[in-house]
Design a protein with these regions (language model features):
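Conserved, mostly hydrophobic/aromatic
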Residues: 29, 59, 125, 173
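Conserved small/polar residues in nucleotide/adenosyl-binding loops
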Residues: 176-182
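Glycine-rich, proline-tolerant flexible connector loops at the mouths of alpha/beta enzymes
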Residues: 57-84
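N-terminal amphipathic alpha-helix/helix-capping segment at the start of soluble metabolic enzymes
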Residues: 2-28
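Active-site-adjacent beta->alpha loops and helix N-cap segments on the catalytic face
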Residues: 65-69, 84-91, 115-116, 137-150, ...
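Active-site mouth loops of central-metabolism enzymes
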Residues: 30-39, 105-117, 159-165
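Active-site beta->alpha loop and helix N-cap motifs at the rims of alpha/beta catalytic domains
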Residues: 76-134
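Catalytic beta/alpha-barrel core
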Residues: 131-142, 156-165
Length: 186
């Protein structure tokens, strides 16, 4: 049986189909961009790819990271002190576009995206090769509108669900977006 690549299949879905076909689990590490500095982030991304990461979740530091635990908050604080900004992270990914061949998912909050403007942020992220976005504070009610914009740039919107998320809400989320559980218990 031959699988024909669907040209509209996202980089993330394509990666998961490839892993599924090989009966493999995904290795998807998270790192905070800019910790300890933006130059080291470049080295870390390439080393993670070299060592077998299938996808990478790259955090953009934010001054009010409510959805993050203490370790990621500490890392974000260090990254901000090193001068890391959203635009520097996107420029870093743009500079690695020819070297980094695995899907990169940005983890960022909604406020920095609004600062850029939805369309502008999506355009810049797309040009930098971003495959997906996780926006933990994006209200589900805003997700549909944002999803329409983001999909025109071939970027997946990934919504998070918690073990406490009501089942009906999980169904709503899962019918329209990629979802990731926020706990090992799910």
């Amino acid at each position: 049986m031959q699988i024909i690549r669907n040209e509209t299949l996202s980089k993330i879905n394509e990666k998961f189909l490839e892993l599924n076909k090989s009966n493999k689990l995904a290795l998807m590490p998270f790192i905070m961009a800019g910790d300890p500095n933006i130059e080291k982030t470049s080295e870390i991304l390439l080393k993670l790819q070299e060592k077998g990461a299938d996808l990478i979740e790259l955090g953009i530091p934010y001054s009010d990271p409510l959805a993050d635990g203490p370790i990621i908050q500490f890392s974000a604080s260090k990254a901000l002190k090193s001068g890391t900004t959203s635009i520097k992270v996107i420029q870093l990914l743009e500079s690695l576009k020819d070297k980094l061949h695995i899907p990169v998912i940005l983890f960022t909050y909604f406020n920095p995206i609004l600062k850029f403007g939805l369309e502008n942020f999506c355009e810049l992220a797309s040009k930098a090769g971003v495959a997906g976005l996780i926006i933990p504070d994006l209200p589900l009610e805003e997700a549909s509108k944002f999803s329409k914009i983001i999909s025109t740039y071939f970027i997946d919107l990934i919504l998070l669900v918690a073990p406490t998320t009501p089942f009906e809400r999980m169904k709503t989320v899962s019918y329209t977006h990629l979802t990731l559980p926020t706990s090992n218990d799910v």
